[in-house]
Amino acid sequence: MEIIPVIDLMGGRVVHAKEGLRDYYEPIKSVLTSAIDLSSVVTDLKSFFPFNTVYIADLDAISGQELAVGQYQRLVADFPEISFWLDAGIKEEKDLVVLSNIGGIRPVLASETLHDMTLLPGGEETILSLDFRHGQLLGDSRLWEDENLWPDQVILMHLDYVGNRQGPDMGLLKKVMDRNKEVNVVMAGGVRGDRDLELLNDAGVGKVLVATALHEGGLSRTILEIVTKKHCPMIKGSAINVSKLS
């Protein structure tokens, strides 16, 4: 299982996302970093654990502001070992082209903003995010109704669960897995600690987006080492006591 840290960026600062209520987001408070600028937060995340992938939600770009291309060019130059998944509010092909031209960036096509369905299912690098609020898909209903539009990798992002420490939406995950067992689901929202990772691992999830559990200390370095080992199953029977691990 791969754990992918999430960075929510708004007004040039890293913020704490909760339930998708962006008007109320505040600068992040974290046990891993005292910084709120993008580059420093990535540096501190890498110091904590050798993450291969980092997911960034550029909330300014998602809201329609111009993408700060230079910022991401510098980021990939500073961290060439990291694959950055970036949700920058792609609506149509020209938006996708801008991101695709930044080496080291994998664009995320999010249902909340995507207008051009011809971009899907795309190639093997395509990532679709199915965004939900109150159990309803945000965006074009065809993205839920027609699974032929789904690329190999699909993020399930239930905003009600983001930053809420209530566990992942296993019901939504089951609906997707029942419809298409071949899709590689990336689960997002609600993960509290190792018990939730064990549930997702058992359900066949290979990648998980996490923010709150990392920044509040719910996932230790030892836990991350266990769950990210290739072919290493999660411990059965009882969850690992995170509080006793450093």
Model-inferred region functions:
Residues 21-43:
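Short catalytic helix/loop segments, enriched in acidic residues and glycine
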Residues 102-119, 158-163, 190-193, 203-223:
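Glycine-rich phosphate-binding active-site loops on the catalytic face of alpha/beta enzymes
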Residues 2-9, 54-56, 84-88, 107-109, ...:
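Hydrophobic faces of well-ordered beta-strands that scaffold small-molecule active sites
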Residues 47-102, 170:
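N-terminal active-site wall of soluble small-molecule enzyme domains
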Residues 84-103, 171-181, 185-207:
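Catalytic cores of alpha/beta
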Residues 7-29, 94-164:
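Conserved anion-binding
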Residues 118-122, 126-128, 201-202, 207-237, ...:
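C-terminal helical cap(s) of enzyme catalytic domains, especially alpha/beta-barrels
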Residues 67-74, 139-145, 166-175:
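Charged helix-capping and loop-helix junction motifs
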